[in-house]
């Protein structure tokens, strides 16, 4: 799949789910805030409880760019964690390496953040980690590899060009953009994680 095809797919998915998954999708979604297709402008019929919860699960999956298997694993892990299952799910997903690369402003989209990790541009505590699903622990530092910092995408990131299209840096990250370095200072709290989701609906979907 080419970058253009991937971009179009993300825009279409954004409109179907009712959330902007990329900066380009945000621009288009503002102009056409309805589902794609011939009947996109018509009012959506009353949905079943199942359909509502299914869409909420799909929204969460899309925002983290993960597979069904990965999301279900986060749910299963959450059921064995103290506290509310949904909050535990969000905290777990938010500590993914690719998610934090995006939150720090090193990348513009989730897909780009994942690509940077897979292509071995990202260090965790000085060591290359090429698994997007790697869970970063409080106190650990992520940084763009010194050799990679000369690349145009990272030079742009260091200048803060992505900050206008990304949510504000969350309180659990201490970011030094010029150095392309960020530290996870503590566990993320569910209410401060910048994703659009009714997490209880997701829990109810899997618990049914």
UniProtKB/Swiss-Prot annotation:
The keyword Plastid does not apply. One of its GO terms (biological process) is ribosomal small subunit biogenesis. GO terms for cellular component: small ribosomal subunit. Residues 95-155 form the S4 RNA-binding domain. GO terms for molecular function: rRNA binding; structural constituent of ribosome. The gene is rpsD. Keywords: Ribonucleoprotein, Ribosomal protein, RNA-binding, rRNA-binding. Part of the 30S ribosomal subunit. Contacts protein S5. The interaction surface between S4 and S5 is involved in control of translational fidelity. This is Small ribosomal subunit protein uS4. The lineage of its organism: Bacteria, Bacillati, Actinomycetota, Actinomycetes, Bifidobacteriales. InterPro entries: Ribosomal_uS4, Ribosomal_uS4_bac-type, Ribosomal_uS4_CS, Ribosomal_uS4_N, S4_RNA-bd, S4_RNA-bd_sf. It holds the Pfam family Ribosomal_S4. HAMAP family: Ribosomal_uS4_B. The keyword NADP does not apply.
């Amino acid at each position: 799949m080419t970058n253009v095809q991937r971009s179009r797919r993300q825009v279409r998915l954004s409109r179907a789910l009712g959330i902007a998954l990329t900066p380009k999708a945000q621009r288009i979604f503002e102009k056409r805030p309805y589902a794609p297709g011939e009947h996109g402008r018509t009012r959506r019929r009353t949905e079943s409880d199942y359909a509502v919860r299914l869409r909420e699960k799909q929204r969460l999956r899309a925002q983290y760019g993960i597979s069904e298997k990965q999301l279900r694993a986060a749910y299963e892990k959450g059921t064995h964690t103290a506290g509310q299952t949904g909050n535990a799910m969000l905290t777990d997903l938010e500590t993914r390496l690719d998610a934090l690369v995006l939150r720090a402003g090193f990348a513009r989209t989730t897909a780009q953040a994942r690509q940077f990790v897979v292509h071995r541009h990202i260090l965790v505590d000085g060591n290359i980690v090429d698994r997007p699903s790697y869970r970063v622990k409080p106190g650990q530092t992520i940084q763009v590899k010194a050799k990679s910092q000369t690349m145009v995408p990272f030079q742009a990131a260091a200048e803060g060009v992505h900050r206008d299209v990304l949510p504000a840096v969350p309180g659990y990250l201490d970011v030094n953009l010029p150095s392309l370095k960020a530290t996870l200072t503590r566990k993320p709290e569910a209410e401060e994680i910048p994703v659009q989701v009714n997490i209880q609906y997701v829990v109810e979907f899997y618990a049914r």
